Amino acid sequence: MASAIPYLPPFHCHDIPLHSIGVHSFEALTLSVFQEIWGSGSPLLVTDVRRCFKFQWNPEYFIENYGDKECFIVDPQTDYSKKVTVRDFFTEFGNYAGRGTTFSGNSKKAWKLKDWPLSAAFQEEFPELFEDFSNAVPMPSYIRKDGVLNIAAHFPMNAVAPDLGPKMYNAMASDQTLGSKGTMRLHMDIADAVNVMTYATDCPDGSPGCAAWDLFRPKDLGKLQRFLKERLPKSCLDPVYSQQVYLDEHMQ
């Protein structure tokens, strides 16, 4: 578990249609560049963000500071959830040998701790991490909860503002083999989202850990829905909005 700073892996398959996205370092991203890309509705990848954080945001940190707190973790393959301590979950983080296999026997179980904390506000539950996150994000005028250009910061004081986070998402490594449900199913965000990868455990072969994202352009939503409906059971709900579909290697 020595790899605390994620790296950018090469594209895993050149047969998959790819659309270029903007890639900028934290230092090189200017307001005008961001506004042009964001205004077009395109995804943007910003590198070197992790180096802007003060805290480690790794398993050891959460075990030391929140180990006794209880939380619910979920098995994405079955949606089975159970209550454990934060220490229990993060102790197994990166432990491939002791995780057991899924019902198909094809892959290791990949427990996830999603949207943590579930009920309390992040700012109240983790004030030091909230401050660390707020001070580290790129384009703070847009992204910070109190950013002057963040529309969510301007709700009337007597109104109930939506909870737009931040939230933490922690998941053990999964794979894309046939039948896998990964750790994040296909879905559509209800608002623009900022995702910061703060930690990745090394893979069993020693290579750096990473997170794989499949992003689709909004204008391709109809094509994606038709493609999936042709390949899924007729009784299946909307393949995007139901959040029940995972794009395994066969679907890709």
Q: Residue locations for each model-derived region?
A:
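Active-site region of the double-stranded beta-helix
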Residues: A2-S40, R50-Q252
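Basic nucleic-acid-binding interfaces
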Residues: V46
